[in-house]
Amino acid sequence: MVVGFNHNVMYKGAVYHVQTEDSGISNPLITTLLYSEGTILASKKTSYADIIKVDQLEKVVEELMKEQHKEMLRNLKNGEFDDRIAQLAS
C-alpha cells in the first residue's frame, strides 16, 4: 500500500482539500477526493487490478496516484467544479 497525498489549495478565495489514497492489493483502487469545508465536491476512482503482477507495483501505483491527484488539482483550477461549488454556496 502506498502512502496517500493531501493538499490544501486556494481557489477563488476559498481553501479546497484534495486527498488521494491507495486501498491496497486486496482492494486495488486509487481514490481521489476533492473537499470543500468537509463536503465532497468530486471524486475519482481508478482500479489497478489489471496490473497487480507488474514489476515494482508500488512505484507504478505511486505514479498513478500522483497523476490522478494532479489531475484533480488541474480540474479544480480549470473551473470544472465551478457549477458544483456554486450549488453548495446557494
Predicted regions and their residues:
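Acidic, low-complexity intrinsically disordered segments
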Residues: T46-S90
